[in-house]
């Protein structure tokens, strides 16, 4: 008799996605981050749901409702910090996942890659709106500064900003709508993840060599379910260490001060996972130019497949490209550091050099390196 998992309409989908899925036998630990990105939103939705039960999206009570969650709700502090630090873990996994895609040439699966970029934008938007909800100083001023960037759009900019605010400044209407969007977006993200996986399973997974592995496939279960479980345990351990020992390590102390529109913090900065883009924004003295650079810092990912000039898919056997890739990683870490520094010498210059290097590596140096490597292959 045929196993029910192969005949039942619903179980059949799960079976083809998680159990009998033919998977390359040589995929490394870098492929674990895909499954970890399935775990992270589940944690966020679950903890977020419990937080939403106690949170009030009103400018007068938002800050005190978060305080109430931490002080009076049973394990409220744990739920809150799991949610906040869970977002940090989410972005760590996201950035490594994207980096792995660039390194091993996974961007040649165009549909999967493009849905991934849309997912990245959606997650960034969700995280930004979530940061506004506690209504601390950095929440308020972060929301004011970032939404104000839209005013750089010619003709419709100012109208657009006031439309998003629901008034003439960031106020009650803004907070309410941000809460509504922050609640609904994770479910839209979950739907997009399904589409992402649908396109991935059309082609099958890439592997470190970048060579088609149809002749060497193994079932996903038990091999990769066990491997992914190890990844889950490592991520949960890291998250719990962060939450239980230093929950405020990645936060901003200014956000423990209630929002005050009469008092601007000395250094307005977003959460650490946006600092690289924030540094690129600040490195351009022109407002519209800065906004375009900010958007392009992520949108440049969509151009990468068009600039693939190498005869090989993966960087596994391309030493020049490998060096450039790790320089790019170091550059992003430098930008992250600069984004958290005040706008003064020498940070301005370092930020500008790092921003130019970021775009140069992706748009000019990597395609050139690939062409040189193609020539070397003929020698």
Curated annotation (Swiss-Prot):
Positions of transmembrane segments: 33-53, 77-98, 113-133, 178-198, 226-246, 288-308, 320-340, 347-367
GO biological process: mitochondrial electron transport, ubiquinol to cytochrome c
Positions in coiled-coil regions: none
InterPro entries: Cyt_b/b6_C (IPR005798), Cyt_b/b6_C_sf (IPR036150), Cyt_b/b6_N (IPR005797), Cytb/b6-like_sf (IPR027387), Cytochrome_b (IPR030689), Cytochrome_b_C_euk/bac (IPR048260), Cytochrome_b_N_euk/bac (IPR048259), Di-haem_cyt_TM (IPR016174)
A single MF term (Gene Ontology): metal ion binding
Quaternary structure and interacting proteins, as annotated: The cytochrome bc1 complex contains 11 subunits: 3 respiratory subunits (MT-CYB, CYC1 and UQCRFS1), 2 core proteins (UQCRC1 and UQCRC2) and 6 low-molecular weight proteins (UQCRH/QCR6, UQCRB/QCR7, UQCRQ/QCR8, UQCR10/QCR9, UQCR11/QCR10 and a cleavage product of UQCRFS1). This cytochrome bc1 complex then forms a dimer.
Note: Heme 1 (or BL or b562) is low-potential and absorbs at about 562 nm, and heme 2 (or BH or b566) is high-potential and absorbs at about 566 nm.
Entries under SUPFAM superfamilies matching the protein: a domain/subunit of cytochrome bc1 complex (Ubiquinol-cytochrome c reductase), Transmembrane di-heme cytochromes
Cofactor annotation: heme b
Record's subcellular location: Mitochondrion inner membrane
Protein name per its UniProtKB record: Cytochrome b
Job of this protein: Component of the ubiquinol-cytochrome c reductase complex (complex III or cytochrome b-c1 complex) that is part of the mitochondrial respiratory chain. The b-c1 complex mediates electron transfer from ubiquinol to cytochrome c. Contributes to the generation of a proton gradient across the mitochondrial membrane that is then used for ATP synthesis.
